[in-house]
Amino acid sequence: MKFLRLLILYFLFLSFHIYGQSVSFKTYMNPVIPGDHPDPTLTKIGDYFYTSGSSFNPTPKIYRSTDLVHWEVIAQPVSASWPEYGDEPGGGIWGGHMVFYNDVYWHYFGRGGETGGGIMYFSTAEQPEGPWSVPTQVQVPAGLFGLGVDNSIFIDEDTGKWYLLTKAGESNNHLVELGNDGQPTGVVLDLTWLNPGPAPYPYGWAEGPVMWKYKGYYYYSFAQHLYGEQYVMRSDTLTDDESAWTIVGDNIFTGTPGTYNRPNHISPVVMLDDSTSWTIAHSYHSNSNWYAHGRQGLLCQVTYNDQGFPVIQYPPSSPVQAPDLPSSGIPWMVPKSDMFDATTLSPNWSFLGYTSSATYSLEVQEGWLYLEPYGESNTIIQNDGEHNFSLITRVDFEPQSTSHEAGLWIMNGTETHFAKIYSTVNSEGNKAIAFSFEGTKYEVENAIGSIVWLKLVRNEHNMSGYFSPDGSSWTQIGEDINALTLDIKQPPPPDYNAFTGNQQGLYVKGKYAYFDLYIYRDAYTDIIAKNPTNRYGVSSASTYLSGINNDDWAMYAGVEFGGNTDYPKTPVSFGIIASSASSGGIVEVWLDSIDTGTKVTECNISSTDSLDNYQVFTSEMEPVSGRHDVYLKFTGIGTDELFRIRLFKFLTEGDSITSIEDHASRQMPQDFGLMQNYPNPFNSSTKINFTLPKGSKVELIIYNQLGEKVMAIAQGEYSAGTHQLYFFADNLASGIYYYGIKASSFSQMRKMVYLK
C-alpha cells in the first residue's frame, strides 16, 4: 500500500522530481564538502572524479563528481561490520585513496587508533559503487618497521608502475612499489632524508604525502601537520636520490587567508582538458567557535610559477571561478533526507565503529528503519557541517527505563557532547520526551503515545527541541540551549574537539526503535537567510543576508518539501521577512538551478522605509514535492542595496504566518553586557557570557593583575544575541585575573579567580 501511495504522489507531482538537480555555476563557495573531510584524496577516472579521506570512527565514504563542485556519496569501501574496525574516537579509518589499476578499483586505507592501529589495508571492487571486498592487510617490506596510516597511491602512467606513499613517523617517508596483486614488490624508494631527526624536524610531521606528474616532472607534496604549511618538491626522475629533487621550503598556499585560513593536506593534483589544475584540501574554520565541524573539504585551483612549482591561493571568503566542467545534476553535498523506502541503507549513512549488520534493517517493517543497540547504543550519522537546519524524525518506541532513549542528536567527534531530543521514560515511570545538552535538560510527559514526531533545530550554536503528534503542529520543549561547547575548539585534554568533526543523525539507547524518516532541512521551518550554502554577490551579516543587488543569488541546499506518504505536506505559499530602504525588488524562488531549473514563485519586496524595519512578504506558489536545492534569485533596479532578508519558509494550506511575524519581533538583548564568569573561582576552565543588542566587532581580552594582556579569547564579528565563551587556564599560574570586553562603544571589565 505504501508503494502504491508513493506511485500516485509521483505522478501527481511529476513535474517536480523527488531528487532535484543542480547545475554547475560559473562560481562556487567553499567548502564543497561541508563538515569533516580530512586528509582528502582525489582521483580522475574517465569523466568522473572521486574523493575520500580519513573518516576515523564513522564508516568511510567514497564521493563522486563530474564538476568537482557537486559531490554525491556512492559507496562505503569498508563495512562497519568489518571485525577489525574497532570502536574508538579518532581510531577507525585513516586516509583513504581509491584508484583504478589493472582493470580493478582499489581502495587503500590505514587502520588508526590505540588498539589495532598502524596497519595498511586495501579493498577491491569491480565498480566504484561496490560491492567492496573484505579488506586485505598490506605486507610490510623487509627493512621497514611499518607503513603508517596517512598514505596515498601514485600511478606512473608512463611506466605502468604504481606506488604506495607511506608515512610511518616523522622521518619515515617511503615510496613502496606495488605489484598486480596490490602487495609490495620489495622495491622501496627511501626518502628518509626529506625530514631527518632528531627533533625539531624541519617539516614537522611531513605527513599526508601525495604525488602527481606535470610536464614531465614528478611532484611530491606533504603537510606540516593536520593544519599548517603545505610543502612540495619535484624531480624529472622518480628516484630516492636526494640530489635529484628540488624542495620548496615555503608554504605553497599564498595570498590572503579567508574563512578557511589554515588549508593543507592537499590531494594529488588533477589537470583538466582545458589545462587548469585542481586539488582538494582540508581546513578548519577560521573562527575557533566552529572548529568542531572538522577539517572541511575545499576545492582549490593550482597554478605553476615561472620555476614550475605549484602555487595555491588561500580560499577566499567570496565566490571563486568554478572549473569548466559539465554538471550531471548532482545536488550540493549536505546531509540527505531519507524516507527509508529502500531495502538497503543509503551509503550516506555511517555507523560509529564496529557495528553488526544484525542491529539494523529496512525490511523488518516496510518503510521504517529498525535500529537496535550494539552494546549500550547505536546510531546512523551524517556530517554536521552547516550552521542552520532543522532535523525531523518520526519514531516508534516503547521505552521501559530512564536509560532507554530513541531520537535525534548532534554529537562531537570525540563522542563527549550530545545535543539531543528523544523519547524516553521519566523518573516516575511515565513516557516522556526530553531535550538536553550537557547539564541542561527539559522534559515533558508524552501524552501522544509510542509514535511521536521529533524536531531538533540548529540556529548557529543555539539548539531548540520540539515534538508533535502529526508532524504539523509543533510544541517546543523548554527553552533554547546554547551548545557552543559542541562546536568550539577545545585543547587536549580532555576533548580535542577539533580532530574529528561533528556528526548528526538518529540514535537508540538501551532498546530498539523504528524510525519512519529523517529530514535534514525542513521547508516548513524557519530557514535563516544569513547562512546560505552557496551564494553570489550577497554577503552574510550578523542577523541577515545583505549586499543584495540585481542578479545576485543565494542557495540553501537539501530543502525537504515532503509530498509523500511519510511526510504528506505540500506548500501553497512562500513567506519571507525582509526590509528595504529603496524601491525594493523581487525574490525569485528556483528549484535545483537558476534559469534551467523550475521557478516556483516570485515574491515582491516593497519599501519598508528603513533597512531596520523588517516586514513579512508572501506569495502563492505551485505544489512542490521532494528534496531540492532552493535558490533565491534577486532582481531590481538601481545600484543601492535592494533589500535585506532575515529568514524565509514555505507554508502549507491553513498555516499561519504568525511564526514568521514572531521571529521578526523576537526580543534580542536590549543592552551590551558582560556577565560574571561561572564557576568563579574556577579550576581549569570557566564560562564567560556576553550580550550584544546588535551585530558588533568584539574583543574580549584576559589580563593578569599587572594589567598585562594574557590572551584574547574573542576577536571578530559576532551577531546580536547572547554568546558564551570558554576560557581554558591550564597553562597559567593560580591567581586573580581580569577579563574585559570592547564592542562598538561599549567596554566593561570583571575579575575572576583561578585556583589550580
PLM ranges: what are they?
Residues L6, N57, P669-G673:
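Short hydrophobic "helix-edge" motifs at membrane interfaces and signal-peptide entry regions
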Residues M1-S22, E661:
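Bacterial Sec-dependent N-terminal signal peptides
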Residues D655-S665:
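Short, compositionally biased serine/threonine- and acidic-rich segments at solvent-exposed termini, linkers
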Residues S610-F617, A720-Y726:
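Aromatic sugar-binding surface patches on proteins
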Residues Q21-K569, S573-E588, D592-T596, L611-E620, ...:
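Carbohydrate-active catalytic/glycan-binding domains of CAZyme proteins
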Residues L42, I153, V395, L545-G547, ...:
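Hydrophobic aliphatic residue packing
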